[in-house]
Regions:
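Accessory carbohydrate-recognition regions in carbohydrate-active enzymes
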Residues: 22-378, 382-426, 432-498, 506-517, ...
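ATP-dependent phospho-/nucleotidyl transfer catalytic cores
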Residues: 503
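C-terminal motif of bacterial Sec signal peptides marking the signal peptidase cleavage site
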Residues: 18-19
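Bacterial N-terminal signal peptides that target proteins for export
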Residues: 1-9
Length: 765
């Protein structure tokens, strides 16, 4: 019996919607499109947790909202690339885009390429004919009347294309396609039977991005040609010039005929891509691969259960069910990155851009957005999967060994120099102080110290010297030699200095525990230098010039994106970045009363921003508190430090209910590799860690009647919110295992010991 394309889509939809009970299978609560609109920059592609390959739909090439390759408002698909980032504010990847076709294959751009979001072979699509669940993506390509589906393992993808009756079915492999039009300067392709091997090398955010590709078709290739723009350049070329595409022809197809295309990648060499494909996708088993991906996600999302007061998740009210969808979608996003970047044989491309032998049972990772993720993602993982954090630390240590310096933000084994601080120290200090040390502690500590002290020697020659001021900013030099970072000598001086202070404090915690008194004192003294940027006459942290005077003019609401004294923010947001010394910050303001008055002013100030080039990252505003970007994420919990927990509770409630939605534009800013989601997960459970490196959680306002955290040590920790409702946002009483808590804090040790945290909620503070 032949099935039409429409029937296939209906069948796939029914299978997904009726798969299981959401209380038993949390993948059914994942909305893959949350964050694909607005400026969330997520994507609905098919991945397994931390997958090295990220196959999915690509709908645009240019601009900020092309960062993941997909944007919900678009109505055309360029094809399906095999790599992408999730939620970032910088764009890269989009490697080896494929598109199944029928009829004549068009390859030229219409109009100017640099202004066109779509290629000549793009197909219209509708969201009504689009499906996505963890590990699966499917869509009807209107132009070709093809139902295209994708699923994946860690290193390999398999496409299933259901064709209509056609006289000329085929596919296009765009060897040059990449997000934001990187400059491709090396390219190879070779077809042998039904196997396609390709390679390209380009630069954009990554200064030297190299990737190998192997794909195999299930239907014999009848013919193929290679074109550059619209010019045929032959069949038997191996090395080709940029802007080349491979046009493959399968010949006729019957109605609902399925053609499969399986593919893999490697950062090392062609043999690596081949081994990855043979090891992880030996057969043409799309359904089996999808089921395995589903089971992996089902297990990953089962680490936390949300329940009604009486009953399970199915007994929640409609609002709470929608919030549960945001929660589990967030948990999904939190497990996408960092990504494995190592072949099945253990080899990986190091930060020196050389091949290294690694351990097959200890994957090497890339995509460390540490400026974002040190705040909530890694603290979350320390609770539900600390072994994953330890694996991250081992990879970061190896990056330091191979490249000479632990990166702030690495992408495909390239130093990007992106963002500020050295937040490897935060991740390390947090895990170290929580007792997790399954890594070489001596090496880990060595690289934390190395990251904090200004030194450009020993950095791999593979990293171009023009990147040195970004991966090893002079801010560290000025801090060491002058005690502050002059605003007229270093861009983003205040933000860089404040983050250095926090990172220095993190190193000091480890040094002190190890008995390294010299380094402990050195880094602790540096951690207190934040006081040099506080101007009591205005009550804000502000830029100080080399001659010791304050930079003028000054307005706390002013922003000049990445070209002022702050980083993606202004003085309103950055003046609170002293998470490691709240008591010291309170003293700067003149005591608790003045501190509270200033803190209240942050949330009551006008949200109007000043400047001609205001940072688009300043979003999700409550007053001048900007939840859409990371520097603000800890501030709400400062109220607990001044004995005003009710204020923390009502502000957490406000953010959870007004800045997160079950919709494509449901995030107030970039998702940032899981950070925005991790903030929601922790706070909706009822607590947050405002200072990673200090293993203490600040209690806020839980959203759900009952949450059970299934910890890897086998002990469950349950948070019960009695009398919980939309209006009952204040915590009247708190008990831990039956004993009253007199302060709104919980230690990591208490949490990991298991038990019950009972919060009695009230409508009045």
């Amino acid at each position: 019996m032949k099935r039409t394309i429409s029937a296939l889509f209906a069948f796939a939809s029914l299978a997904i919607l009726t798969a299981c009970n959401p209380a038993e299978d949390h993948t059914l609560l994942v909305n893959m499109f949350i964050g694909t609109g607005g400026h969330g920059h997520t994507h609905p592609g098919a991945m397994v947790p931390h997958g090295m390959i990220q196959p999915g739909p690509d709908t645009r090439i240019h601009d900020w909202d092309a960062c993941s390759g997909y944007y919900y408002e678009d109505d055309s698909i360029n094809g399906f690339a095999h790599t992408r980032l999730s939620g970032t504010g910088c764009a890269d990847f989009g490697d080896f885009l494929v598109m199944p076709t029928t009829g004549k294959q068009c390859v030229d751009y219409v109009g100017e390429k640099e202004k066109n979001q779509h290629n000549a072979f793009a197909s219209a699509f509708t969201h009504e004919n689009e499906l996505a669940t963890p590990g699966y993506y499917g869509v009807k390509l209107e132009r070709y009347n093809i139902f295209a589906e994708i699923t994946a393992t860690c290193r390999a993808a398999i496409h299933r294309w259901t064709f209509p009756q056609s006289e000329d079915a085929g596919m296009i492999l765009d060897l040059d396609y990449c997000i934001q039009d990187q400059t491709t300067y090396e390219m190879e392709v070779k077809v042998s039977g039904d196997t396609i091997r390709a390679y390209h090398r380009d630069n954009w955010w990554q200064y030297d991005h190299r990737l190998y590709f192997e794909g195999i078709t299930s239907k014999p290739i009848q013919s193929y040609e290679i074109v550059r723009d619209t010019v045929l350049i032959g069949e038997d070329k191996t090395k080709v010039q940029p802007r080349c595409k491979l046009l493959v022809h399968f010949g006729p197809t019957n109605e609902a005929e399925e053609i499969f295309f399986k593919a893999s990648i490697s950062g090392v060499d062609a043999e690596g891509a081949h081994k990855n494909l043979m090891a992880e996708m030996p057969a043409w088993d799309f359904d089996g691969t999808q089921e395995k991906a589903h089971e992996i996600w089902k297990e990953t999302l089962s680490k936390i259960d949300i329940c009604a007061a009486e009953g399970d998740l199915n007994d929640l009210d409609s609002l709470q069910k929608s919030q549960a969808t945001i929660f589990y979608t967030g948990l999904y996003h939190a497990n996408l990155s960092p990504n494995v970047f190592q072949d099945v044989d253990g080899r990986y491309l190091g930060m020196d851009l050389k091949a290294h032998e690694g351990k097959t049972d200890d994957p090497y990772y890339t995509i460390f957005s540490l400026w974002d993720t040190h705040r909530a993602l890694h603290p979350l993982m320390s609770i539900i999967d600390p072994a994953q954090n330890e694996a991250y630390i081992r990879s970061l240590i190896q990056k330091g060994e191979d490249g000479g310096l632990v990166p702030k933000w690495d992408c495909g084994s390239n130093y990007t120099g992106c963002m500020i601080g050295y937040h490897y120290a935060s991740l390390l200090a947090d895990m170290y102080t929580k007792g997790y040390r399954n890594y070489d502690v001596d090496l880990a500590y060595k690289h934390a110290v190395r990251s904090g002290e200004y030194d450009t020697l020993g950095i791999t020659p593979a990293c171009p010297s023009w990147l040195y001021p970004y991966i090893m900013p002079k801010a560290r030099y000025y801090r060491q030699t002058q005690g502050y970072v002059p605003a007229d000598l270093e861009n983003e001086s205040v933000a860089k200095a404040l983050e250095l202070c926090y990172n220095d404090w993190c190193v000091a915690q480890i040094a002190a525990d190890r008995g390294d008194t010299l380094k402990a004192n050195q880094f602790m003294n540096w951690s207190k230098l934040y006081t040099n940027y506080f101007d009591p006459s205005v009550g804000f942290m502000r830029g100080k010039l080399a001659d010791g005077s304050w930079r003028t003019p000054f307005s706390p609401a002013h922003s000049n994106h990445r070209q002022d004294d702050y980083c993606e923010g202004n003085a309103y947001q950055w003046s609170w970045f002293v998470p490691h010394d709240v008591e010291g910050l309170i003293a700067l303001y003149g005591g608790k009363e003045a501190f509270v008055q200033k803190l209240d002013g942050l949330f009551s100030a006008s949200s109007k921003l000043e400047g001609e080039v205001v940072s688009a990252d300043i979003s999700g505003l409550i007053g001048q508190y900007a939840h859409g970007n990371e520097p603000s994420h800890h501030i709400i919990h400062f109220y607990n430090a001044v004995d005003m927990p009710w204020r923390t509770q009502e502000l957490v409630d406000s953010v959870l209910n007004t800045l997160y939605f079950n919709a494509p534009d449901g995030l107030s800013g970039n998702e940032d590799c899981g950070q925005m989601s991790a903030w929601y997960i922790l706070n909706s459970m009822g607590f947050y860690q405002p200072c990673p490196g200090r293993p203490v959680y600040s209690i806020g306002r839980p959203l759900f009647p009952r949450v059970i955290i299934h910890q890897p040590n086998g002990k469950d920790f349950t948070i019960i919110a009695k009398n919980n409702s939309r209006k009952a946002k204040y915590v009247r009483n708190m008990t831990l295992n039956g004993k009253a808590l007199d302060k709104p804090y919980l230690t990591h040790e208490q949490l990991m010991a298991g038990g019950e945290l009972v919060l009695e909620m009230s409508e009045t503070k």
